[in-house]
Amino acid sequence: MLIQRCTQLMVELDAEPRFALESLLSGGGGLDSTPRWMAYAPHLEAPIQVSLGELKALEGISSSNPSEHNDLIREYGEQTINALLNNGLLLCDEDRHTLLRERDQVVRDVAWWPPAAIAMAQGRWKDVDIGARNERGLMMSSQEMVDAFGAAPEPEYRRQENAATVALSKPKNTAFNEILSKRKTCRNFDSDKIISAEDLATMLHRVWGAIGTLELAPGAVAVKKNSPAGGGLHATEAYVLVQRAEGLQPGIYHYLSMQHALEPLAIFSRQEMRELMYRCVAGQDWFQDVPVMVVMTARFDRLFWKYRRHTKAWRVVHLDVGHLSQTMYLSAADLGLGAFVTAAINDHAIEQALGLQTLKEGAIAIVGFGPRLPVNTTLELDNLTLLDLN
């Protein structure tokens, strides 16, 4: 059996208090603050506690030149090697590690900056249900947060408290201001209405549709859309989750931005889509009546083709999605539709539904849009105290 270390690995000395049943049973406080070494690897789902002996073995075993199992046992001991094989920090050529080797190969093939790869891989949510937590009283209200943590930092941030300010001229008021004033996050969608084919097509093209291309070199094409993107690569994909849309069956569709067309991936019943969409937005039940959601994913292999192991590239992913989200909001406001964006998503459920390969393509955020209810039943930012600039 041939063995090698995983491609990327980082360790942390963790001394955060954690629940310890042994402490509780022995009359202690139930917390353990003993420092422990935790190993993080992007091909794994969670950090692994390791001993100093296991760290020594990981230091000495190559990630590129496999070694014989028996040779490593003689050098580091059977218990150490088997423990590292069992937790996936060491990879072998047997069938039991096929999936882990495939994930590790993606880490090799896609030029991730290691800290970003670990943050992306291990920051993913699984089976989070915010609605259920609300029902059980596990979510803190604003008042409870103030009581527990003190007042939030003030919304106006000044660097010099007593310095004189420089007055600016009154801003122009054009037709664009009216659209901006209508931009808001909607939590009240009308479950009896569908989104029209025209509105859906307009939203998809305005936000994610390609306007033109420019060949920078053979094999390197930049894309122009209505929002900016790092390097002109536009590595964000749009997957449309349809619950109620004119002319479309409920299901999952991939938007082909260069063709302005939908690629059907899976067809479901309306109830199945409602349940899937609820899981995808982590149980935020105030969004479940929206007729369509769009999952925005990042194609890391495309973006990192240019920005290889770049310390800033992962930030660009989130900037791109932010630009698209604002374009979505403004387009929805123009069409008189409600809209939202959320990054509180169950990554695992999305990856399974869309068939994504972790770290090659990953979900970043979900947006949704459609007809609003005439009267709010869930809190939105209405009744604002408007600022007077006169």
Label for each model-derived stretch:
Residues 203, 238, 294, 313-350:
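Small-aliphatic-rich amphipathic alpha-helix that forms the alpha element of a beta-alpha
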Residues 326, 340-343, 358-362, 367:
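C-terminal structured interaction module
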Residues 274-275, 308-315:
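Short, surface-exposed loop/helix-turn segments at secondary-structure junctions
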